[in-house]
């Protein structure tokens, strides 16, 4: 799940930079990892990760779909709102799984100093 947290942070940084191509990629990565976690880790420290109930998955499905729409629309204002809803859903899921001490939030700055989150100006142009 730590990898999901990394994608969650990179999703914010990409959206904030209006790099919609990267934001779409990070969102797809998150969705893929959440799906894989259910299959690959049926339990983690006695928590039924692989048996997340429909309510838990619905908690995430709505915000994920809303984020996808905002990315497609390139709508930064509503992207921020949708991102915060996803973050709330992540924290609600943690509460449900009895790990509410893991609190996710918007990143404050970037720890990914080797990655440029600004969109490329044109195809084929090397990043700064």
Tell me the role of every PLM-derived stretch:
Residues 1-128:
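Sequence context surrounding c-type heme c attachment/ligation sites in exported
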């Amino acid at each position: 799940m730590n990898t999901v947290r990394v994608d969650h942070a990179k999703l914010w940084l990409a959206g904030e930079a209006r790099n919609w191509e990267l934001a779409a990629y990070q969102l797809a990565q998150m969705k893929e990892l959440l799906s894989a976690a259910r299959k690959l880790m049926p339990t983690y420290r006695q928590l039924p990760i692989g048996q997340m109930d429909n309510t838990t998955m619905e908690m995430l499905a709505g915000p994920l779909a809303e984020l996808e729409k905002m990315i497609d629309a390139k709508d930064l204002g509503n992207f921020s709102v949708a991102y915060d809803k996803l973050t709330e859903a992540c924290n609600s899921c943690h509460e449900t799984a009895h790990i509410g001490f893991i609190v996710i939030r918007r990143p404050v700055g970037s720890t990914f100093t080797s990655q440029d989150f600004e969109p490329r100006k044109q195809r084929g142009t090397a990043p700064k």
